[in-house]
Amino acid sequence: MAALCNNLRAKLVSWQPVGLFHTGVRLLAADKDLLVKLRKKTGYSFMNCKKALEQCANDFKQAETWLHQQAQKEGWDKASKLQGRKTKEGLVGLLQDGSTSVMVEVNCETDFVARNSKFQQLVQQVAVSTLRHCQSHPENTSSYVKGFLCGDELLQLKADESLKDQLALAIGKLGENMIMKRAAWVKTPSDIFVGSYMHGILMADLPSLTNMTFGKYGALVICKDSDGNLKSNISEIGRRLGQHVVGMNPLLVGSLEDESGGETETKMLAQPFLLEPSLTVGQYLQPRGINVLDFIRFECGEEAESTESTPT
């Protein structure tokens, strides 16, 4: 018995603690300053930004890329789940730059999301991509060029990334089904101008969105100043004509010889002018030397008729 106790005592004296090692990757804690910076730049949650910095050992650029990739994957997953849900809300967006004007429509499920700056940024991305697409077309010095893009065509365009990927990111962030419905663009020579009007204007909160106009109804009116004497008033006349197109919803321009059919008239020049009902649009324009060549009208959520898609 004594020998057994001595043997046990010897083993206890000689025993050394053995360390237990975790074989997984040890994550570095997220740097607080980088966390705040990443959150502010990307708009993702603190938890996701923290996870990104931990995964990327506090490498800011890698963390930003990781966040983007994860959000895109989640966005596509969410987009497939939400596909088919009705998108009757949204915004019409208007962007003009020199001789180029574009108007786009992007739809979502609720007006609440339409008022979110992230959704407005998506509308801006669609407009900018359409603008670049339009500007890539050769100049026509004798007349204007007009084109339309449907939703499938828009998804193939790129801003910094493809609009298809941008759509997935927005769906992932905002949690609603969204569609890029349509876009129209106009490119004009120096003697033709485009009047514009937006109804139901939604004021943007972000300074980066100040070049955009958002609303529920939009119009572009393509005009020619025959006399060349209205340089200072062109913008206001164009705005009034756009307001008429939104309010009276003409179907075609018509001609000065058309007789007015009253309130049911669908030819623009023969309609009572919205802002001066005692005159037709043609009678309002004739003494001012303005010729209306064409117009485009968007109403958010309307059933869009098939429109020409060329030139694209």
Swiss-Prot record:
Associates with the EF-Tu.GDP complex and induces the exchange of GDP to GTP. It remains bound to the aminoacyl-tRNA.EF-Tu.GTP complex up to the GTP hydrolysis stage on the ribosome. SUPFAM superfamilies: Elongation factor Ts (EF-Ts), dimerisation domain, UBA-like. The keyword Nucleotide-binding does not apply. This is Elongation factor Ts, mitochondrial. One of its GO terms (biological process) is mitochondrial translational elongation. InterPro entries: EF-Ts_dimer_sf, Transl_elong_EFTs/EF1B, Transl_elong_EFTs/EF1B_dimer, Transl_elong_Ts_CS, UBA-like_sf. Keywords: Elongation factor, Mitochondrion, Protein biosynthesis. One of its GO terms (cellular component) is mitochondrion. It comes from the Eukaryota. This protein may be expected to contain an N-terminal transit peptide but none has been predicted. GO terms for molecular function: translation elongation factor activity. Belongs to the EF-Ts family. It is found in: Mitochondrion. The gene is tsfm. Its main location: mitochondrion.
